[in-house]
């Protein structure tokens, strides 16, 4: 059953805390993308549910920084002024902070693209339908949840979670997009690469 847009939940990665971090003072917490860039001087590390989660989150942040500062360079070029990208990075390094008004301007421009459940959900394809299969449980989405028949060395219990928070879903989505292994994938309606139902 599809929900209307007004019924759909909202979870925007720019504003909602979802990135687990360890702080310089030894505390832990979750921050939004906007907070992450605001508090860079007080954040020691990104700390995912598993260590491998940090890399895709960091990669997303790096893409945001690259795009934001590329817009600065494009603006200079539009006015026939040359700007050295190394000088831009040197400014950031010396200030020990990012240009928050610049980042906030970028976040405002792309805000709708970072909603986990919006009409164009973050890093997802709208309208995919499984060809002949029920949905997999959420545990299939989580890398360190073992299948019951293969449970041996795991830090988790045999009981697979039935639900996860929106923050966890965002982290595991990035993880899956970065590290999902090859193999048999559930066929979706319209996929022309399906052979023998796989």
What is the role of each PLM region?
Residues 1-156, 160-198:
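Conserved small-residue
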